[in-house]
């Protein structure tokens, strides 16, 4: 692994973790809105990067390392989603699971269409 790549991933990861924490603080409550927001936003952004790279060939490797591998890996979180879901009442837990997966999937589809529209 090259030192520059490590630095790019680490910098992105640091920023992603801080942003995730900030959103969780801004959106407190009994339902894990912060985790839902970051997971859906992260799915959209990753979808845009994946489809942008595929269709536009305009996402440089350094951007992919910082944003996708670094930032989005720390910004989105499966482990927090799983832990928060277990702590919810059964109906809210089911809503959280459906919301995270369905909205995340829709976010990727929307990102794909935005990239197609812009290309």
From Swiss-Prot:
Q: What does this protein do?
A: Fluoride-specific ion channel. Important for reducing fluoride concentration in the cell, thus reducing its toxicity.
The record's InterPro entries line, in alphabetical order, gives: FluC
Q: Which catalysed reactions does the entry list for this protein?
A: fluoride(in) = fluoride(out)
Tell me where the transmembrane regions lie: 6-26, 31-51, 66-86, 91-111
Q: Which UniProt keywords apply?
A: Cell membrane, Ion channel, Ion transport, Membrane, Transmembrane, Transmembrane helix, Transport
Could you give one GO CC term from the UniProt record?
plasma membrane
Q: Which family does the record claim for this protein?
A: Belongs to the fluoride channel Fluc/FEX (TC 1.A.43) family.
Location in the cell reads:
Cell membrane
Put simply, this protein is called: Fluoride-specific ion channel FluC 1
Task: Provide the taxonomic classification.
Answer: Archaea, Methanobacteriati, Methanobacteriota, Stenosarchaea group, Halobacteria
The Gene Ontology terms for molecular function here are:
fluoride channel activity
- Species whose genome carries this gene: Natronomonas pharaonis (strain ATCC 35678 / DSM 2160 / CIP 103997 / JCM 8858 / NBRC 14720 / NCIMB 2260 / Gabara)
Primary localization: membrane
Output one GO BP term. Answer: cellular detoxification of fluoride
Q: Enumerate the PANTHER family for this protein.
A: FLUORIDE EXPORT PROTEIN 1-RELATED
- Membrane topology designation: Multi-pass membrane protein
């Amino acid at each position: 692994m090259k030192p520059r790549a490590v630095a790019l991933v680490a910098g992105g990861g640091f920023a992603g973790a801080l942003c995730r924490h900030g959103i969780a603080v801004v959106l407190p409550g009994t339902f894990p809105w912060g985790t839902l927001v970051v997971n859906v936003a992260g799915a959209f952004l990753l979808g845009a990067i994946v489809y942008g790279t595929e269709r536009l060939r305009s996402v440089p490797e350094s951007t992919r390392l910082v944003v996708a591998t670094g930032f989005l890996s720390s910004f989105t979180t499966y482990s927090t989603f799983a832990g928060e879901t277990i702590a919810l009442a059964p109906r809210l837990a089911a809503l959280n699971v459906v919301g995270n997966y369905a909205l995340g999937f829709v976010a990727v589809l929307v990102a794909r269409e935005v990239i197609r529209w812009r290309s």
